[in-house]
């Protein structure tokens, strides 16, 4: 359904009740097609992920922090498959994603919601688990207003 509607992660959808119990109506917040600069996850030949700000065709309203374009869904599916049998620590995924996302702005700060959306591209993680991983790690600095910074990036 998401692909048929040309939706990306972070697209706005509306869920409405109906007269029938257990039945809901799901609709996308449609808008005229245009290209927007949004976070895009690219899958490298080595299976690594890279985030970049690229112009992508957008067909629905979206949350700027949550929206992530995924041009190579098959490559991302392969990453999910490869990771499924391994017990990868959330901490290592947080470092990897923070390292990638911090490249997208000059201060190298990463907003919690941006990180939450990026982490959920490669694993399903509830917000509280991610918040705990951020708040208990001395190598991650909270700089205010839900922004975080990797401690070693200040030494560049």
Feature roles, as predicted:
Residues 1-156:
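Acidic, low-complexity intrinsically disordered regions
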């Amino acid at each position: 359904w998401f692909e048929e509607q040309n939706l990306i992660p972070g697209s706005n959808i509306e869920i409405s009740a109906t007269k029938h119990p257990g039945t809901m109506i799901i609709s996308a917040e449609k808008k005229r097609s245009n290209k927007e600069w949004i976070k895009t996850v690219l899958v490298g030949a080595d299976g690594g992920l890279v985030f970049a700000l690229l112009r992508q065709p957008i067909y629905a309203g979206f949350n700027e922090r949550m929206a992530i374009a995924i041009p190579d869904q098959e490559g991302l599916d392969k990453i999910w498959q490869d990771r499924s049998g391994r017990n990868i620590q959330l901490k290592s995924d947080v470092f990897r994603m923070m390292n990638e996302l911090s490249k997208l702005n000059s201060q190298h700060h990463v907003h919690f919601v941006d990180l939450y959306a990026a982490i959920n591209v490669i694993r399903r993680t509830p917000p509280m688990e991610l918040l705990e991983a951020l708040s208990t790690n001395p190598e991650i600095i909270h700089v205010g207003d839900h922004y975080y910074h990797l401690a070693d990036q200040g030494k560049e």
